[in-house]
């Protein structure tokens, strides 16, 4: 089991660090009182490996509870529970700038003076910093820089950034666009199988409709261009730390054209090794209804 205790100066990036650890598959707990660490560690170690990556944030917000940190750490060490301490810090100048940008008060500031709070916190955390397994100074870090450093230290072996999950959603404009879509494409310019009597009652999941939609040159050209766009965007989205990409394909009713195109794009992405899901949101809707959906 890997048991990571995240602590450090307020404003140094503990929230971003715990989010990054969560993306790496860690079970995360924020602001756990140090007095509860022994029981928490014991419970985790009793899961027989079901939980094998733990991260928890301990910081000065715990008030007087924070003074019990070393007592708790000594106890779990005596129980042969292994742990690591990640300490985050930054320069005074950067911390002041971050607090002013967020318009938040430092938890230890006296009379509203941020620098006073930073100085007091540095003093109180010195002993913790001295025994930290890893110290990261985030003064010159972007969120992405910190994420990459966390991945380097706490990822599994050669683990890289978590893979982007792509969800291809087909939908009908008459029921409203998917509110969570990142990229949205309108395929109502394609020939509509709805007006072919023998195809009307089928959907884009059925071969007759799928073949009909994809037989047109404009369909083939569109799929090719859309595939090119996605192959260009996906690496850049991944590099910027995006974890989910919703690609919405819409036609009038969400049963024929959008389903066919979504299925085609899904297959192309899957064949290229992308982590991809598909959701035909409106495929079972009665096309005579006009209710809006999310």
From Swiss-Prot:
Keywords: ATP-binding, GTP-binding, Nucleotide-binding
Binding site for ATP: 8-15
Coiled coil spans: none
One MF annotation (Gene Ontology) recorded for this entry: GTP binding
Organism superkingdom: Bacteria
InterPro entries in the record: P-loop_NTPase, RapZ-like, RapZ-like_N, RapZ_C
PANTHER family: RNASE ADAPTER PROTEIN RAPZ (PTHR30448:SF0)
HAMAP family named in the record: RapZ_like
Role: Displays ATPase and GTPase activities.
Name of the protein: Nucleotide-binding protein CTC_02495
